[in-house]
Curated annotation (Swiss-Prot):
Listed GO MF terms: hormone activity
Disulfide-bonded cysteines: C22-C72, C36-C87, C39-C125, C47-C103, C51-C105, C108-C115
InterPro entries assigned to the protein according to its UniProt record, in alphabetical order: Cystine-knot_cytokine, Glyco_hormone_CN, Gonadotropin_bsu, Gonadotropin_bsu_CS
Propeptide: 133-138
Primary gene name: Tshb
GO cellular component annotations of the record: cytoplasm; extracellular region
UniProt keyword annotations, A-Z: Disulfide bond, Glycoprotein, Hormone, Secreted, Signal
Subunit structure: Heterodimer of a common alpha chain and a unique beta chain which confers biological specificity to thyrotropin, lutropin, follitropin and gonadotropin.
Signal sequence bounds: 1-20
Pfam families, alphabetized: Cys_knot
Family: Belongs to the glycoprotein hormones subunit beta family.
Source organism superkingdom: Eukaryota
Organism: Mus musculus
Glycosylation sites: N43
Protein name: Thyrotropin subunit beta
Length: 138
């Protein structure tokens, strides 16, 4: 293998490791309220991807804030509100959710993100579905 090819491969690997791939990603979620007749399928965007992290040796000697890792999180987002069809009059039929506009690698903000790794939850409807298409329910 020539030196130029070897150098270009090493350069590509180094750039791939240093770059963060944290971008808005399409995501489908299902809103299922017990009291309402329908489940609402919502297409939105969330922040997902890879952020560069390091595991520090000598963790015993560092303060806790120095041990936190960067995560892929919201830089800018907006909230959208939809109406879940088939809800009785005594139930509030509105559901608000964040839509990622741009993302960044940074500390997790508990004001707008779930920062705890949970077990995988089922993400499906248990009732007939109604779809939300960006401005109105169908």
């Amino acid at each position: 293998m020539s030196a130029a090819v070897l150098l270009s491969v090493l350069f590509a690997l180094a750039c791939g490791q240093a770059a963060s791939f944290c971008i808005p990603t399409e995501y489908t979620m299902y809103v299922d309220r017990r009291e309402c007749a329908y489940c609402l399928t919502i297409n939105t965007t969330i922040c997902a991807g890879y952020c560069m992290t390091r595991d520090i040796n000598g963790k015993l000697f560092l303060p806790k804030y120095a041990l936190s890792q960067d995560v892929c999180t919201y830089r800018d987002f907006i909230y959208r509100t939809v109406e879940i069809p088939g809800c009785p009059h005594h139930v509030t039929p509105y559901f608000s959710f964040p839509v990622a506009v741009s993302c960044k690698c940074g500390k997790c903000n508990t004001d707008n993100s779930d920062c705890i790794h949970e077990a995988v939850r089922t993400n499906y409807c248990t009732k007939p579905q109604s779809f939300y298409l960006g401005g109105f329910s169908v």
